[in-house]
Amino acid sequence: MSDNITKLSPAKINLYLEVLERTSSGFHNIESLMTFCDFGDIINIKKEKSFRFTIDGPFSKNLSLDNNIINKSVSFVEKLLNKNITVHINLTKNLPISSGMGGGSSNAATVILCLIEMYKLDCKEDFHQSLFSLGADIPFCFFRKSALVTGKGENVLEIENDYENFFVLLINPMIEISTKKIFEKLTIPTRKDFTPFNEKFLCNTKIINFLNSRNNDLEKEAISQCEEIKNILDVLKNETNSLLSRMTGSGSTCFALFRNKEDLINAEKIFTKKFKTFWVKTTKIVNSFETL
């Protein structure tokens, strides 16, 4: 049993996110092609005599130690083990809060993954489904592979693809947006010409055309709450060589895909010059991380 585990808790991006319907229970059924970046928060877990949870990093200041999804994740694993967990969990928070990059969900999933590895827990077949009770993005974040996510987030289908060589620019205006408010005010679009997802779109020559034909249905409502999102997207579309530019999740982070590093760096320079208070990060798509 390893007594000290450190893992990247990667940022996720929704390459597209379409809301198909609102269910009678108040949830929303979606279709989203989701992937990861090679940047994110860092989770370190060490065996100790009692439980401790600490947070550091550039975005640690406004995070609560008590009301945090990591504590819920620990309780989730304790129920599976039927014993108390005595570890020190340290979260290094590198991602902005409430940014649409799945930070909290990725943190929770990574903690669960580390604890399963540390305690050599044998997961049951329905384990992935039970993760949904912690949060809609957690099944995908635990899966740690590019996937088509449907239903309310509980259905995660691995996608074989060859677009890992895309470079990514992430931009956040440092304005938090409430996912709950976005969905409460969302008007679900009517789709006359809906193109079902097909894996044949996933080669480099076709994926960009396919993605540009899809949307993030949360973008319009997010812009009504944060006009800076529109400003970011306008610059990405009109002043850079981006292949795709879009908001991820419920915002306020936007991303753009680039074919080469030169275009990526040029776009980064534009944003650091125009928007000095924004968070800007260069990274790459990663199709999969180590899992169980």
Where are these regions (language model features)?
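Glycine-rich beta-strand-to-loop/alpha-helix junction loops that act as flexible
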Residues: 103-104, 247-252
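Phosphate-handling active-site elements
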Residues: 78-88, 114-134, 260-273
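Short hydrophobic/aromatic beta-strand micro-patches
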Residues: 255-257
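Conserved, helical-rich catalytic subdomain that frames metal- and/or nucleotide-binding sites
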Residues: 53, 143, 148-244, 259-272, ...
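ATP-binding N-lobe of GHMP and related small-molecule kinases
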Residues: 1-99, 116-122, 160-164, 172
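Short, basic/glycine-rich phosphate-binding loops at helix/coil junctions
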Residues: 49-64, 111, 132, 205-216
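DPxDG-like acidic metal-binding loop motif
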Residues: 99-126, 140
